[in-house]
């Protein structure tokens, strides 16, 4: 390494985030920021990529990067194998946090809340628009389980391809969607000298309360 980790930094230069700019509804602000990210972030960056954090039965946190696949007034939707590590963790402790980071915009959004499964119809609706290879892969992969080697996975894939040679794969019972129902959403805008803007929305009853946090 030619540069030490302690020396790796850059200053943020974009405009700030004021209460006057921010709508009272955090979903409105998220959509605005997400639309900005779609227009600004350059490929191969995926603006809908997020880090999802869950907690296991022992209280140990786990995180991984997933893709956001749905957003409405209820919450934020993603899909996974229900029998995966994250699926088992969400079954035991149905709460999670997700973080979006858009470096070109110097923005971050943190979301926390309860997680529930979407309806089977919603899961099937999304499953049917996935590429064929992804649909077959959802049947073939025993996600998060130990396998012997890559060859074992490829053998499982070959067997699954034969199974669905003359029929379209339907949504597996062990696969589907989750919706995070937000209780807190924090918007972070990078500012010079690390004096960042942080607007924090918290759900109280049916109303969102907005407050500013110190950086």
From Swiss-Prot:
Family, similarity comment: Belongs to the pyridoxamine 5'-phosphate oxidase family.
Protein's UniProt keywords contain Oxidoreductase: yes
Keywords, in A-Z order: Flavoprotein, FMN, Oxidoreductase, Pyridoxine biosynthesis
EC number(s) given by UniProt: 1.4.3.5
Domain of life: Bacteria
Transmembrane segments: none
Cofactor: FMN
Annotated protein name in UniProt: Pyridoxine/pyridoxamine 5'-phosphate oxidase
Source species: Ectopseudomonas mendocina (strain ymp)
Gene3D superfamilies: Electron Transport, Fmn-binding Protein, Chain A (2.30.110.10)
SUPFAM superfamilies (UniProt xref): FMN-binding split barrel
Top EC category: oxidoreductase
Assembly and binders: Homodimer.
Pathway: Cofactor metabolism; pyridoxal 5'-phosphate salvage; pyridoxal 5'-phosphate from pyridoxamine 5'-phosphate: step 1/1; Cofactor metabolism; pyridoxal 5'-phosphate salvage; pyridoxal 5'-phosphate from pyridoxine 5'-phosphate: step 1/1
Biological process terms in GO annotation: pyridoxine biosynthetic process
Ligand binding (substrate): 9-12, 69, 126, 130, 134, 194-196
Function of the protein: Catalyzes the oxidation of either pyridoxine 5'-phosphate (PNP) or pyridoxamine 5'-phosphate (PMP) into pyridoxal 5'-phosphate (PLP).
Coiled-coil ranges from the UniProt annotation: none
């Amino acid at each position: 390494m030619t540069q030490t980790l302690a020396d790796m930094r850059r200053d943020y230069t974009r405009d700030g985030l004021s209460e006057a700019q921010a709508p009272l509804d955090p979903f409105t602000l998220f959509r605005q920021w997400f639309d900005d990210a779609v227009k600004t972030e350059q490929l191969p960056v995926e603006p809908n990529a997020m880090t999802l954090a869950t907690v296991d039965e022992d209280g140990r946190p786990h995180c991984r990067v997933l893709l956001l696949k749905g957003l409405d007034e209820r919450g934020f939707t993603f899909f996974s194998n229900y029998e995966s590590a994250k699926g088992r963790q969400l079954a035991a402790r149905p709460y999670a946090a997700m973080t979006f980071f858009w470096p070109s915009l110097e923005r971050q959004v943190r979301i926390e809340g309860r997680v529930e499964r979407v309806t089977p119809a919603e899961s099937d609706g999304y499953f049917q628009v996935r590429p064929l290879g992804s649909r077959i892969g959802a049947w073939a992969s025993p996600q998060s389980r130990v396998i012997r080697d890559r060859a074992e996975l490829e053998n499982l894939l070959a067997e699954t391809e034969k199974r669905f040679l003359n029929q379209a794969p339907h949504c597996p019972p062990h696969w589907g969607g989750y919706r995070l129902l937000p209780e807190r959403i924090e918007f972070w805008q990078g500012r010079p000298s690390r004096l960042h803007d942080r607007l924090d929305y918290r759900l109280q009853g049916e109303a969102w309360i907005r407050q500013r946090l110190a950086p």
